[in-house]
Amino acid sequence: KMAMQYYVNKNQRREKVLSLKNSYHGDTFKTMEVGDSSEYHFAFKQKTNVDHINTNIEELEDAFKNHGEEYYCMIVEPLLQGAGGMKMYDISFLKRARELCDEYGVLLIFDEVATGFGRTGNRFVSDLVLPDIVCLGKALTGGYIGHAATVASDKVYEAFYSDESGKALMHGPTFMGNALAMTAGIKSLEIFKRENYMKKISHIEEFSKKLLSGYKNPKIKEIRIMGGCIAVEANN
């Protein structure tokens, strides 16, 4: 929503989104559209203004070469795709995506609802590659109460900063700024820092790799480890 209006406010017409295969971004209509999960959204016809690519730099470059000036955003789950099968990929893909988004004037969105707060072994993947918009949730409140945050760069903010009411981002959910959720969020952040969860996650990753490295079993196709995530893919 923010990315779409960003270009409207700048009097530019862009109508396409670049997303990833195996992606999942939620269950509202627009997030279902940019996701690649027919298993979840089989009852809803998929629109044709979204391109889905693999986490392959050659496919990424081809997509921008063919449609770069039509995209208003590229949205990804950075480094780790959760509901799409715990798929893990290299940060070089995100670095190239950042370069191409800058070259073609496309907003880069990181959906860190699942990957944020250390899940990948990084506090945020956004610390390594800076997006224009980042979405946060889940661990933000420690799982005790539903709450989320959307963080935007100065560039995005400035496109909405105007005396013209038509340029404002009209967004006001009933539970926005909920006091109980905000309190849980503040405490969750305090605990995350005080108990040094990044160090704990590092130990989990190190131990898991030591334990599972080289493990062979005819029933197991692959074992993937990243940060606090362990994916064991069975042979089907």
Where are these regions (language model features)?
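Conserved N-terminal phosphate-binding loop of PLP-dependent enzymes in the Aspartate aminotransferase
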Residues: 1-236
